[in-house]
Amino acid sequence: MGLWDIDKIPYVGREKGPQEGLAFHYYDADKVVAGKKMKDWLRFGVAWWHTFDQQLVDPFGTGTAQRPWYGKYSDPEDEALAKVDYAFEFFQKLGVEYFCFHDRDIAPEGDTLRETDKNLDKVVDKIEENMKSTGIKLLWNTSSLFTNPRFVSGASTSPFADIYAYAGGQLKHSLEIAKRLGAENYVFWGGREGYENLWNTQMKREQEHMAKFFHMCHDYAKEIGLDAQFLIEPKAKEPTMFQYDFDAATAINFLRTYDLMDVFKLNLEGNHANLAGHTYQHEIRTAREAGVLGSLDANQGDKLIGWDMDEFPTDLYETSTVMWEVLAEGQIGPHGGLNFDAKPRRTSFTAEDLFRSHIAGMDSFAAGLLVAAKMHEDKVIENLQAERYSSFDSGIGATVENGTASLASLEEYALDIPQSKLIEATKSDHLESVKATINNYMIDALAEA
């Protein structure tokens, strides 16, 4: 059995009933869908922090998690090293080829940055050994510039220069680790890069400091030969009242303002989209059309609760819309994947639940891929959209698109059109039928799986 009292998770399809929770019903890693293997479309990654560090605490109670390494180690460094073995066996039994981590997820902090880096390097040594022996790769790493109390007012936006300097030193070593481990991406999530109250905040100054920080990071990455794609992860709020990377559109505006569009793409999360008042599909479409889709965090929120819940994704409608966008793009960014930034519920506390929850998420996205592939094969959305905007393919509409129209030419065209003709020019969306069509594709595609 190994360190986990569970066998490698098999693909069973319809061989077992729908209640079998320790097998894949839709995720068949090597199955070719829309010209690529499932595993290559989805590129699943496991999040170290939720999977191996999360104790399932909530604001009203202590942790309920039961993990096989609990109670075995009195020294945090020994436990950190042991968790590397548990992690890589978990990845292999789940059949996942990527993982992600924050620097402070994998090793305990010391009193100084020098001590902390030393602790970190010991664990990185062991991670590197396991990566070489298993072939498992680092989708992305990042630096935790929000958990320690020193970051109470931010890191790159902190009003305290000593904290800014510490953040820079911490980030420098994190980039060196990315280089060493061959990270395909590097993520910046500004958990406390925002404000609690505008009265004591110089917002422009803080954002300028953050932009300078990002440019320093890019300069150092070039210096050491790190070619990982830099990613910003937008989030509207939590833990701050307002974060500067509120949503995809806000982050894109920041990148354009500070000459960073050629450096960064976006890492988008479903639950974060909800916190900004958007759907996951909206955020992905916004990034795609700006050319900055980088990677995805796979989770969902509860639509009735305005919190960052980090639930495992089980909403097939949402996974289908996400994968429709991914297939339209051709990939999840240049080097992106689907990282499960998700944790089991507090009542799902056994070690086995870590497998069950990841299986649920992986199957949900595999099912979404099958639905999206069928929709793209039939060009149902492409044809619908082409018909809706067809008036811009010729006549006055074509002059708008080719740039020859002017207000004068539009006026001349419209002056004598009666209202009856204008109303006649509009067409019904048949929106309810469109929504029903999506449902029908979900049912039909999964029935054929």
Swiss-Prot record:
Q: Does the keyword S-adenosyl-L-methionine apply?
A: no
Q: Where does Mg(2+) 1 bind?
A: 233, 269, 297, 341
Q: Which GO terms describe its biological process?
A: D-xylose metabolic process
Q: What is this protein called?
A: Xylose isomerase
Cofactor list: Mg(2+)
Q: Name one GO cellular component term.
A: cytoplasm
What is known about its subunit structure? Homotetramer.
Cite the active-site annotation. 102, 105
HAMAP family for this protein: Xylose_isom_A
State the free-text cofactor note.
Binds 2 magnesium ions per subunit.
Family membership: Belongs to the xylose isomerase family.
EC assignment: the record states: 5.3.1.5
**GO MF term list:** magnesium ion binding; xylose isomerase activity
Which keywords does this chain's UniProt record carry?
Answer: Carbohydrate metabolism, Cytoplasm, Isomerase, Magnesium, Metal-binding, Xylose metabolism
**Reactions mediated catalytically:** alpha-D-xylose = alpha-D-xylulofuranose
Q: Which residues bind Mg(2+) 2?
A: 269, 272, 308, 310
Annotated S-S bridges:
none
Where found in the cell? Cytoplasm
